């Protein structure tokens, strides 16, 4: 696959640890943070299937509120969790698409691949 020369800003919005209201992600505060980030001219958001609740949070705070072409969204395959077959990896990708509601990802990364797991992805 060829590099397409995608341009992204120098600062990305990571969604690993979001503000919480008790045990659940505070969506209203996350929306405010997303708005401040976008208003400052930044557009790259980074989430992951393994960041509990973050894909649903980005759907509510970004995807449902901004035109899809106005931001770049990356998520990750949690290679260390339940991805020993092509079917498991595809299932995790499909789950991420559904949870974010984004329609597509600008970037899809293999998260924490590690030497002991890379052969699974070489196989498929």
Indicate where each model-derived feature is located.
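Glycine/proline-rich, positively charged
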Residues: 35, 83-124
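A short, structured active-site edge motif that brings together acidic residues
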Residues: 69-82, 108-111
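Generic beta-strand or strand-like secondary-structure segments
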Residues: 57-60, 76, 88-95
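Active-site mouth loops of central-metabolism enzymes
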Residues: 16-28, 76-90, 116-120
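N-terminal binding-site loop/beta-alpha segment at the start of enzyme catalytic domains
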Residues: 1-71, 103
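A sequence-level detector of short, solvent-exposed, charge-rich linear segments
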Residues: 49, 56-57, 77, 115, ...
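Short alpha-helix boundary/capping motifs
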Residues: 65-66, 74-75, 124
């Amino acid at each position: 696959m060829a590099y397409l020369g995608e341009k992204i800003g120098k600062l990305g919005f990571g969604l690993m640890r979001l503000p919480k209201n008790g045990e659940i992600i505070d969506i209203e505060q996350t929306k405010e943070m997303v708005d401040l980030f976008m208003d400052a001219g930044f557009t790259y958001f980074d989430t992951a299937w393994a960041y509990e609740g973050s894909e649903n949070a980005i759907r509510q705070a970004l995807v449902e509120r901004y035109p899809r072409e106005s931001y770049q969204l990356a998520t990750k395959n949690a290679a260390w969790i339940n991805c020993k077959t092509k079917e498991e990896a595809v299932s995790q990708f499909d789950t991420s698409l559904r949870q974010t509601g984004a329609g597509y990802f600008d970037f899809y990364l293999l998260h924490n691949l590690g030497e002991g797991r890379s052969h699974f992805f070489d196989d498929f």
